[in-house]
Amino acid sequence: MYKTLLAQVFFHSIAKKKLYFFWLPRLFSLLLVPGFLFDIEILFLFHPIILLHASLGLSVIIEDYIHIETIKFQYLSLIKLLLVLLINLNILYLL
């Protein structure tokens, strides 16, 4: 029915209503292209985006490879907690 693997992934994502999980990491990876962050002040301003990109990647890995629901929930909660903590520390550092 679908011609390419990308089309299968795209239509499967629409069916699950999680299309943002497909496009959001790709958007953040474009923002993190070398040479884009050429100044250290700009690096600190984009630090939350880098942390969000890392959090999305770790969440996908945990959802794919950990099959025990309680451990999966604990790890995902820990990642979100650490993400919020690190972003708040970064904001306090900028003040």
UniProtKB/Swiss-Prot annotation:
Protein's UniProt keywords contain Electron transport: yes
The answer to keyword Cell membrane applying to this record is no
Q: Which residues lie on this side of the membrane: Mitochondrial matrix?
A: 1-19, 63-74
Topology versus the membrane: Multi-pass membrane protein
Q: Which GO terms describe its molecular function?
A: metal ion binding
Instruction: Provide the cofactor list for this protein.
Output: heme
Question: What gene name does this entry carry?
Answer: SDH4
> What's the name of the protein?
Succinate dehydrogenase membrane anchor subunit
Binding locations of heme: H53
Annotated InterPro entries: SQR/QFR_C/D (IPR034804)
This chain's function reads: Membrane-anchoring subunit of succinate dehydrogenase (SDH).
Annotated source species? Porphyra purpurea (Red seaweed)
Q: Where in the cell is it found?
A: Mitochondrion inner membrane
